[in-house]
Amino acid sequence: MHDKILILDFGSQVTQLIARRIREAHVLSEIHPHDVSDEFIRDFKPTGIILSGGPNSVTETDTPRAPQAVFEAGVPVLGICYGMQTMAEQLGGKVDSGHLREFGYAEVRARNHTSFLDGIQDFATPEGHGMLKVWMSHGDKVLEMPQGFQLMASTESCPIAAMADETRHFYGVQWHPEVTHTVQGRAMLERFVLKICGAKPDWEMGNYIDEAVENIRKQVGDEHVILGLSGGVDSSVAAALLHRAIGDQLTCVFVDHGLLRLNEAEQVMSMFADNLGVKVIHVDASEAFMSKLKGVTDPEAKRKIIGAEFVEVFQTEAGKLTDAKWLAQGTIYPDVIESAGKGKKAAHTIKSHHNVGGLPETLNLKLLEPLRELFKDEVRELGVKLGLPPSMVYRHPFPGPGLGVRILGEVKREYADLLRRADAIFIESLRTFIDKDTDKSWYDLTSQAFAVFLPVKSVGVMGDGRTYEYVVALRAVQTLDFMTAHWAHLPHDLLGHVSNRIINEVRGINRVVYDISGKPPATIEWE
């Protein structure tokens, strides 16, 4: 049984980073809504509790508060930003709406000697005071600390920037240790989790595989499982894990909608059916998808059609497997957090061809989500340990509707054939061109790269003749979180090489352009 850190989410945009930083310290952490019941907290048996930041003001009525059981659980508690403010208010301190807000970098002076900050600093003043470079994002501030607390840190505009009750092991910080801008943030969280809470750092992917396999076998027994295999990272890793656990009790359904990358269907079948021995039903539904997409130009309409058609095809195939009792999905932890914590998922339309939401009710199948505790980077690590090739596990994101949203306007088979060949040349070139400064390929240096088919023709000259052919745009971005992105400054010789190959090798394209738009104002995908 692993030690667990309970994170209560008050709505911060960076709450997931808290969990990730703690897991990087090899301690299991889970995020749950701030309004969980006292009974839930007792049953969870946390080794420590963290209260996240949030957009609300403690000074207003009807804003969130922590369950009273948090402060009665007998375990260390860390309040971050709003979490510190609600801790102060609930334990008898005073919070006020600050007239001088703090957003961005700040230098914090450590005060007194506390177990939370002792020995942690970025630099010292000539007087010997320990200083920290942190990231602030708050308007409210604590005016009076609750009884039993001592001052832990301060800034010029925020006299109580951190507080500590060493007896009860309650700590509050006004800054965000989970973001990389707080230089010593990782050290602070590790100090709290490993030293103050005393959590054992035993959250390892190797151990996770053994535990997951055991749990899957207990849950499934001798019953059969069906999984929609898209070729994406999540469903691929889920298939590999399930196959290790239950072998031939797993059947995967791979739906080819005709909008996959070059040779992708063959690669998926080779990897899972031939190399791993997974039972895979390959359904070539490209004609049905193309028929439904004929004449449709609106991007969201295309997404909905592709999603609905996938559900229909998958439902038909699943209905033939009369012995299947479970439906497996590649749901990962961020999906679980959004669904449980903010209710966002319920409002989302189908965005990918492998989203099979609603099928459990339709098919009367029990739901199995073997990856629901893992973040994306953990899923990738798991995939490698399960024997999937890194080239598959670490490849760039690919939209669920596939090339359907990389072909502007109406989707035609001719357009898809041209695009997948151009895209393959671009990706192959990114993999082979090495940056001399980093000794990494440009594929590894970009977060996402792809070609886009533009349904317009331009005049060109090839040989002694005039051409009138289609245009392809290349897109490559660099990003940490895909919320914002910079266009990648690819070397000119690389772009020239790609353009030359596409124009010479893909008949029907005579012009290649490069997209230099950032996000915002543009999105990463064109549709």
UniProtKB/Swiss-Prot annotation:
GO terms for molecular function: ATP binding; GMP synthase activity. Its EC number is 6.3.5.2. It catalyses: XMP + L-glutamine + ATP + H2O = GMP + L-glutamate + AMP + diphosphate + 2 H(+). Residues 4-202 form the Glutamine amidotransferase type-1 domain. It comes from the Bacteria. GO terms for cellular component: cytosol. Pathway: Purine metabolism; GMP biosynthesis; GMP from XMP (L-Gln route): step 1/1. Keywords: ATP-binding, Glutamine amidotransferase, GMP biosynthesis, Ligase, Nucleotide-binding, Purine biosynthesis. Residues 203-395 form the GMPS ATP-PPase domain. InterPro entries: Class_I_gatase-like, GATASE, GMP_synth_C, GMP_synth_GATase, GMP_synthase, GMPS_ATP_PPase_dom, NAD/GMP_synthase, Rossmann-like_a/b/a_fold. ATP binds at S230, G231, G232, V233, D234, S235, S236. Pfam families: GATase, GMP_synt_C, NAD_synthase. The active site is at C81, H176, E178. Coiled coil: none annotated. SUPFAM superfamilies: Adenine nucleotide alpha hydrolases-like, Class I glutamine amidotransferase-like, GMP synthetase C-terminal dimerisation domain. Homodimer. NCBIfam families: guaA_Cterm, guaA_Nterm, PRK00074.1. Catalyzes the synthesis of GMP from XMP. This is GMP synthase [glutamine-hydrolyzing].
